Amino acid sequence: MIYTAIDTFYLTDEQLRDSPSRKDGIDEATETALRVYGCDLIQESGILLKLPQAVMATAQVLFHRFYCKKSFVRFSVKRVAASCVWLAGKLEESPRRSKHIIIVFHRMECRRENVPIEHLDVFSKKYSDLKHDLVRTERHLLKEMGFICHVEHPHKFISNYLATLEAPELTQEAWNLANDSLRTTLCVRFKSEVVACGVVYAAARRHGVPLPEDPPWWNVFDADEAGIQEVCRVLAHLYSLPKSQYIQVYKDNDSFTHRRTSDTNASKESPATTVASDKGTPVPSSSSQEKDALIKAGSDKVKEKGDDDGKTLPSEPNGKEGPAVNLKSEKSESNVDRSRERERDRSRGRDRDSRGRDSDRDSKGRDSDRERERDREADRDRQRRHHSKDRSSGYSDKEKSRHRSSRDRGDHYSSHSSRDKDRHRRQ
């Protein structure tokens, strides 16, 4: 039993030799080739999707962890690789849409199999099946991981180790070796510190850079010599392998370019063939024999129905079948009449519904028209009141001016009359 926890997903050599794929009859070479093939798919798809290297590294670690618990026979390496990329993008905060994942893996498979790249319609049944498989495989991944997807990569230790050892020229070489180590099972066998020390040692051996031996430099980084030697041995074995090729071990069709065999067979089968197979009649391969078998199966079915109907009806002692035939014809006519009446009722109900909808629409339209008329009348009343106020104010001003002029005139006349009176008095 493999228990999953944070930073404890590490297996022994015995557990790797007793993996589920080995139990299903897959040898070590085939399992190694399939692991490398799946990691190559993840790396190539990450480049096409423009993902950071951290996403591809996390996806490859999840890929190896999953196949430590499940077999290549029961889970497709292509579908699992696609789901690992999809899940790792979410974990590393660089998500990609499922549509882009499926299209990229579809194009990669067309290239690898040297077939024409065809357009993948996102509204087709094939695309919906691929998306369903992608989501289902992601659920399997999370279930087997126990929803613990924490991954620690050796890359973050490389820069610190080389800075301490004062060998910055080995950085790029060690980084490349760390990327290549993710295609092997080193990520599920050793801690990231040990893998980082191993790739630093391999890079130093390649470039001929001496490392301190007294005391041993790896003791400072919590590593041992045996682990470093094993890391170098696994990397050397990886570079000796040929280019990874796909090996068909999955039971069902896992192609991104073709449909499943079960779907194609189900689409090819007709109802008549299923009837013939249920009755036990073999279906020949040639077209003429198929037609004869289908016709025979249909006639047998009609005869059986007729026999069943005859058994249910009472038979006359003299063997007269006229009334039975009449009863059958009457029943069929009554059934036809009933079906016609049902259709009429349905059509009437539809007409009523449509009329009700139309009436509702008309009533709503009338209400809206009435509201508009009310608003218009209210606006007109406001305008009238405003005009009336303006007129009344104008009239008052005019009246005031008139009153003022009359007073002025009265004063003028009164002043003249008083002067005349004074003159007469003086005279």
UniProtKB/Swiss-Prot annotation:
The keyword Chloroplast does not apply. Residues 263-276 have a biased composition (Polar residues). Keywords: Cell cycle, Cell division, Cyclin. Belongs to the cyclin family. Cyclin L subfamily. GO terms for cellular component: nucleus. Coiled coil: none annotated. Residues 258-427 are annotated as: Disordered. InterPro entries: Cyclin-like_dom, Cyclin-like_sf, Cyclin/Ssn8, Cyclin_N. GO terms for biological process: cell division; regulation of transcription by RNA polymerase II; response to salt stress. GO terms for molecular function: cyclin-dependent protein serine/threonine kinase regulator activity. This is Cyclin-L1-1. It comes from Oryza sativa subsp. japonica (Rice). Residues 289-311, 328-382, 390-400, 407-421 have a biased composition (Basic and acidic residues).
